[in-house]
């Protein structure tokens, strides 16, 4: 059983080292460090020192393309999307979003540069978090059509025409869904393959939604990619009407069944941000449900209940963090 936590928002090494000691004291075995475009540009060597300190603390170091291109999960903004508006994603309505389209060869080349930088830190695993086409509703400033979807850029139109022999429609239908899924799978195969050639290990986290959901990816096809070594999902139940037993239990069962079939370990993420006061004990329940369900890797997002990031801070981050440490000890001792 491997137990981890996401860590971000601090690049001052002596403070990171103190936090790493705290992470060890809370019964973690690995840390998922975010590595945004800003980190790649300005903190590359610093991140190498942070990864080295992580190893010195006896922890494994994972690294996450946090918000890179806007294609992966995370609050970090994308400089790439701002620099190259011609490669931004275009909605079916014709509006553009500040997100890069993974179908542009130039963006894929930029992702290979990210892989080079990430591996140069000495990280043990590259963590590909929630790869997706843009979801308009996630932008709090978006007030356009509720049924708009991405992407309808020049690259997507060309590739759709090549694939289906017709123009990319403005209405989202089964053909569009299949096209989007195929292209994201191709993108993931490309970047994980590039990393693996250089000796990198890849972990993939997909949203806990149905394969046929508009924003879903087929789990089996994604998990079975030859250079995906660990597969998981992030059933954050505070955003649902479900209990942790229900949501975490159902999604853990789904992921573990698949991973056992294809012979890969499972990772389950537990929500440790935006936790309401008085519900912190649900985190322990979620950890125990994931462990009992057979997940080999569990991780919490994020360190110290995300108390340092006001937009997603838990109401009582110190209680959240204490709950994680106690639950991790129990599942590791079981």
Predicted regions and their residues:
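Aromatic-lined substrate-binding rim segments of carbohydrate-active enzymes
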Residues: 19-82, 176-196
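Aromatic-lined carbohydrate-recognition surfaces of secreted/lumenal glycan-active proteins
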Residues: 4-9, 62-66, 126-131, 172-216, ...
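Catalytic domains of carbohydrate-active enzymes, especially glycoside hydrolases
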Residues: 9-40, 120-125, 224-231, 289-298
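Active-site-adjacent "subsite" loops/lids of carbohydrate-active enzymes
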Residues: 62-121, 170-177, 189, 281-283
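Aromatic- and acidic-residue-enriched segments that line the glycan-binding/catalytic groove
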Residues: 70-94, 129-167
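Substrate-binding cleft of secreted/luminal carbohydrate-active enzymes
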Residues: 235, 240, 267-332
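The substrate-binding groove and active-site-proximal loops of carbohydrate-active enzymes
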Residues: 4-11, 32-41, 93-112, 170-185, ...
């Amino acid at each position: 059983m491997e137990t981890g936590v996401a860590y971000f928002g601090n690049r001052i090494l002596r403070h990171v080292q103190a936090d790493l000691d705290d992470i060890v004291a809370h019964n973690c075995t690995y840390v998922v460090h975010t590595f945004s475009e800003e980190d790649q540009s300005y903190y590359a060597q610093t991140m190498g020192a942070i990864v080295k300190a992580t190893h010195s603390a006896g922890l494994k170091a994972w690294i996450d393309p946090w918000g890179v291109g806007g294609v992966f999960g995370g609050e970090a903004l994308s400089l790439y999307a701002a620099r190259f508006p011609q490669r931004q994603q275009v909605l079916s309505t014709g509006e553009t979003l500040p997100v890069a389209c993974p179908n542009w060869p130039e963006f894929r080349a930029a992702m290979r540069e990210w892989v080079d930088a990430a591996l140069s830190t000495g990280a043990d695993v590259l963590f590909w978090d929630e790869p997706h086409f843009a979801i308009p509703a996630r932008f709090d400033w978006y007030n356009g059509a509720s049924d708009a979807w991405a992407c309808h850029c020049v690259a997507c139109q060309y590739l759709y025409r090549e694939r289906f022999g017709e123009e990319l429609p403005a209405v989202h239908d089964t053909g569009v869904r299949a096209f989007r899924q195929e292209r994201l799978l191709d993108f993931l195969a490309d970047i994980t393959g590039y990393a693996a050639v250089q000796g990198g290990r890849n972990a993939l986290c997909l949203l806990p939604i149905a394969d046929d959901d508009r924003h879903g990816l087929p789990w089996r096809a994604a998990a079975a990619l030859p250079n995906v070594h660990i597969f998981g999902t992030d059933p954050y139940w505070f955003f649902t009407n479900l209990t942790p037993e229900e949501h975490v239990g159902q999604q853990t069962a789904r992921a573990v069944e698949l991973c056992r079939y294809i012979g890969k370990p499972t990772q389950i993420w537990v929500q440790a941000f935006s936790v309401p006061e008085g519900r912190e004990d649900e985190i322990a329940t979620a950890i125990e449900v994931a462990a009992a369900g057979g997940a080999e890797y569990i991780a919490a997002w994020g360190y110290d209940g995300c108390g340092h990031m006001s937009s997603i801070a838990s109401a009582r981050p110190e209680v959240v963090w204490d709950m994680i440490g106690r639950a991790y000890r129990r599942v590791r001792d079981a």
